[in-house]
From Swiss-Prot:
EC number: 3.1.21.10
Gene: recU
HAMAP family tied to this protein: RecU
Family stated for the protein in its record: Belongs to the RecU family.
Cofactor binding notes: Binds 1 Mg(2+) ion per subunit.
Subcellular location(s) per record: Cytoplasm
Name recorded for this polypeptide: Holliday junction resolvase RecU
Transition state stabilizer, annotated site positions: K98
Length: 198
């Protein structure tokens, strides 16, 4: 398609540039990368890991016909546990994914008490639990074991954010790839299931 200069297309460009920013899908690119990675793992028979649906509170339903209900008003509830769960090589896996534009830390307000409690319960049952942290400004991704997140959460309750230095010390950097895009199973296999120690 050739774009010839004329008023209509320049007007369209101006209106699209002046639209207010919508932050509703912030982090979606990271989420899409994780979903693509999970699809790859599933297609290769390596793991079965899925994103948990966000609970919705239905407020109002219209019934235009007896057989057709139409949800008119609904709201997202706060997620009750973590983002992803599944099975890898006989092990239960449960993890949260967080993305930030900050360069030196991840805000602790992103982690809710019920999520920390859920991670503690998963670890008590010998499950593999962690958080994937993505620093979008540096394009760096880390796997931080839940135990290290929980320790930081309980010891440093006054902290507003977890420093990148702590994440680098206790976490594992994941280099992005083509297939899979975020090869976190490599870290699990090598570091969390009896491979190399820190």
């Amino acid at each position: 398609m050739v774009n010839y200069p004329h008023k209509l297309s320049s007007q369209k460009r101006q209106t699209s540039l002046s639209q207010p920013k919508n932050f509703a899908n912030r982090g979606m690119s990271f989420e899409k990368m994780i979903n693509a990675t999970n699809d790859y793992y599933l297609s290769q028979g390596l793991a079965v890991i899925h994103k948990k649906p966000t609970p919705i509170q239905i407020v109002r339903v219209d019934y235009p016909q007896r057989s057709r209900a139409k949800i008119v008003e609904a709201y997202f509830r706060q997620a009750s546990t973590t983002d992803y769960s599944g099975v890898y090589n006989g092990y239960y896996i449960d993890f949260e994914a967080k993305e930030t534009k900050q360069k030196r830390a991840i805000p602790m307000k992103n982690f809710h008490p019920h999520q920390i409690q859920h991670m503690e319960q998963v670890l008590a049952q010998q499950g593999i639990c962690f958080v994937l942290l993505h620093f979008s400004s540096q394009q760096e991704t880390y796997l931080l074991p839940a135990l290290d997140l929980i320790r930081f959460y309980h010891q440093d309750k006054g902290q507003k954010s977890m420093p990148l230095g702590y994440i680098r010390e206790y976490g594992y950097e994941i280099k992005a790839g083509a297939f899979p895009q975020i090869p976190y199973l490599n870290v699990i296999k090598e570091h969390l299931l009896g491979g190399k120690t820190r």
